[in-house]
Regions:
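Conserved acidic carboxylate
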Residues: 8
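Two-component/phosphorelay signaling modules centered on CheY-like receiver
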Residues: 11-29
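Residue-level signal for the "D+5" position in two-component response regulator receiver
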Residues: 30, 55-58, 93
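Acidic catalytic/metal-coordinating carboxylates
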Residues: 33, 59-62
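Active-site beta3 strand of CheY-like receiver
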Residues: 44-50, 55
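Short amphipathic alpha-helix used as the core "switch/output" element in two-component signaling
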Residues: 61-73
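Alpha4 helix (beta4-alpha4-beta5 surface) of REC/receiver domains from two-component response regulators
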Residues: 62, 82-110
Length: 120
């Protein structure tokens, strides 16, 4: 079964979101770096990608470009603690499905991931 791919370098944040989504019945795969995310996508294309904007080995925005080159329709959510006004317009131009503030809480993220999940 295809999974939601969570990409974030915060172990605590990833763990919380993973447990939250799994509790609601979503299968989840996690990655802490873009290298791990690329390997996960080569193994199996996810149903939804939820990616942090800033990662240790690159930008979530650049990873969005890579994903869009391979799949134009895959729901891709870009998440960050940064002000969305700083990156949202560029992310949407590059093909992001949604942009969200990680600090808005897990409920909002669950609803946004659920929305993207249903789009497929």
């Amino acid at each position: 079964m295809k999974k939601i791919l969570l990409i974030d370098d915060s172990d605590t944040y990833t763990w919380c979101l993973q447990k939250y989504l799994q509790h609601r019945g979503y299968p989840v795969k996690t990655a802490c770096t873009l290298k791990e995310a690329r390997a996960a996508i080569q193994e199996e294309m996810p149903l939804v990608v939820c990616c942090d904007l800033d990662l240790p080995d690159g930008s979530g925005m650049d990873f969005l470009d890579e994903v869009r080159a391979a799949d134009k329709e895959l729901p891709f959510i870009l998440a960050s603690c940064h002000d969305k006004d700083d990156y949202e317009q560029e992310a949407m131009r590059r093909g992001a499905t949604l942009c969200m503030d990680k600090m808005k809480g897990l409920l909002l993220q669950d609803k946004l991931v659920e929305y993207a999940y249903r789009q497929v």
